[in-house]
């Protein structure tokens, strides 16, 4: 804003008129030529401050050599509240002091200062108040308005911080498998009666009875898989495996009482090298590593068998403790188990919560709409299962309520300090007002949420170009706001993708800065329909002053 400081400076001229050769009318003409430029013409919040740069240009002869002038910028806002800036003192050339000297030949004075932001400053004006001092007299001078309004667009940003609750691994449908097996004698395909009465088969039968009696179970498939131990040659073992598959298929009818499924799958594997490898890995055989190296070096079954037989001492132990466990047929039933529904979980959490495992407790907490109940369930999961995810979610609930100290206590207790925990700690520091500490945590976390939060820190610090770069491609309106404040209106327009009230507000600002009056009206009308509170705020916003 450019002003002639006529009232302010004329008084100084009048005060010193007796010592000057110029007439009063000439002094008035000089005062008319004094100009004050305010940059920006409309003040704006940048970070935590409202910066101002004043440039005063004055003509030759306006300042008496023995006069002094105190000038105080004052921001008047809200219902008449005032915030005074620093007082600047100027002196004539013959004053013996250490203030800025104003030459009688004229010149320019520049001052930079800032105001702290306070609520209500969207409706404000900046004025200069002066006191002239000459020959022992102090005369207050009339105030001069130099700027109107404060742009607070930065405050539209969502400054809460981005974080997500830890998810549960609850499965609506559990894929399960139950099995039993029968063992065969060396080179035999006969299923002995004792095998059908073995513990393995009894446990399988009990499991099948439970599956049949529980409507939550659905059988997906049943298979009989037969094997031969890798001894005696590949061709011979292939036939032996086939014979065992046939005998096992008949045995299955006895195991199930004749209820063989229509989709029974029967497979013959032949030599069971995979089972052999697993058995060796889990054994305490002295030359275990050597045997495993042979398996990795050779793929030909005959070569493998020959090399292992050459280890005579080892082969005796293998023949005694490993091969017998591979002469078998497996009965496998695969089922789907329909887990508790959300409604059932909620009911169980109220009357029999100890039935729930960790995943069930995390799921029922996640679907609860009552924050207090969520916290109760997460705390139960912490107490019963020492659940880090539940503890993290307790921290997230605290952040929701902007209780950063409570959140940090939970986060510090988590055993696995992963990137999500680091990001959440950054949000807690952000809510505590320590943006530098928050930024450090966000950099350590390195997640997409942390990157967006780092952009938010740049935005709140007033580093708009850096903020726009960090927030590019993120959800929400913060990226668009950073683009607006960085002067990238086209990028800002493209960045707003949602249709919420805050987005309409941002679109209206973009339209206003582009001089699009119709766009301003359209988006403010949309804002009124979507968010009455923000609409009322927009009515005071200096961004739209030219369109009212």
What name fits each language-model region?
Residues 2-239, 243-507, 511-540, 545-546:
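N-terminal targeting segments with Sec-dependent signals, encompassing both cleavable signal peptides
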């Amino acid at each position: 804003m450019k002003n002639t400081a006529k009232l302010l400076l004329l008084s100084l001229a009048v005060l010193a008129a007796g010592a000057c050769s110029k007439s009063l009318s000439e002094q008035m003409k000089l005062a008319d030529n004094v100009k004050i430029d305010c940059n920006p013409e409309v003040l704006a919040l940048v970070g935590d401050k409202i910066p101002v740069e004043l440039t005063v240009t004055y003509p030759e002869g306006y300042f008496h050599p023995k006069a002094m002038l105190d000038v105080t910028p004052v921001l008047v806002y809200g219902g008449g509240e005032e915030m005074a800036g620093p007082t600047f003192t100027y002196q004539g050339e013959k004053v013996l002091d250490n203030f800025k000297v104003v030459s009688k030949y004229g010149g320019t004075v520049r001052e930079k200062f800032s105001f702290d932001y306070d609520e209500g400053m969207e409706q404000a004006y900046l004025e200069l108040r002066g006191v002239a001092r000459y020959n022992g007299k102090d005369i207050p001078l009339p105030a001069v308005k130099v700027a109107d309004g404060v742009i607070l667009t930065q405050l539209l940003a969502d400054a809460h911080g981005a974080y997500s609750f830890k998810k549960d691994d609850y499965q609506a449908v559990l894929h399960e498998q139950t099995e039993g097996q029968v063992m065969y004698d060396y080179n035999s395909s006969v299923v002995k009666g004792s095998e059908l009465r073995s513990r393995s088969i009894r446990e399988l039968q009990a499991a099948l009875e439970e599956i049949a009696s529980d409507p939550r179970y659905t059988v997906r498939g049943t298979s009989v898989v037969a094997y031969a131990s890798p001894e005696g040659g590949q061709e011979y073992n292939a036939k032996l495996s086939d014979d065992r598959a046939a005998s096992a298929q008949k045995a299955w009818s006895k195991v199930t009482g004749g209820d063989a499924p229509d989709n029974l799958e029967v497979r013959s594997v032949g030599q069971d090298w995979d089972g052999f490898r697993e058995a060796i890995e889990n054994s305490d055989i002295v030359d275990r590593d050597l045997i495993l190296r042979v398996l990795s070096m050779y793929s030909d079954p005959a070569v493998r068998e020959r090399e292992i037989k050459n280890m005579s001492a080892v082969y005796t132990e293998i023949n005694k403790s490993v091969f017998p466990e591979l002469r078998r047929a497996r009965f496998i039933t695969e089922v789907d188990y329909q887990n508790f529904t959300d409604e059932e979980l909620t009911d169980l959490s109220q009357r029999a919560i100890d039935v729930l495992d960790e995943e069930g407790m995390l799921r029922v907490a996640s679907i609860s709409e009552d924050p207090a109940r969520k916290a109760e369930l997460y705390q139960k999961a912490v107490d019963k299962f020492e659940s880090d995810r539940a503890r993290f979610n307790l921290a997230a609930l605290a952040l929701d309520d902007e209780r950063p100290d409570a959140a940090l206590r939970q986060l510090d207790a988590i055993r696995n300090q992963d990137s999500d925990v680091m990001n959440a700690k950054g949000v807690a520091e952000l809510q505590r007002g320590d943006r530098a500490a928050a930024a450090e945590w966000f950099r350590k976390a390195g997640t997409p949420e942390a990157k967006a939060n780092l952009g938010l820190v740049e935005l709140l610090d007033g580093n708009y170009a850096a903020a726009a770069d960090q927030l590019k491609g993120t959800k929400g309106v913060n990226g668009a706001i950073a683009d607006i404040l960085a002067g990238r209106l086209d990028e800002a327009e493209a960045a707003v993708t949602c249709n919420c009230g805050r987005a309409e507000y941002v679109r209206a600002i973009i339209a206003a800065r582009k001089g699009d009056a119709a766009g301003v009206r359209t988006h403010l009308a949309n804002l009124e329909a979507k968010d009455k509170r923000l609409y009322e705020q927009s009515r005071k916003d200096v961004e739209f002053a030219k369109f009212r």
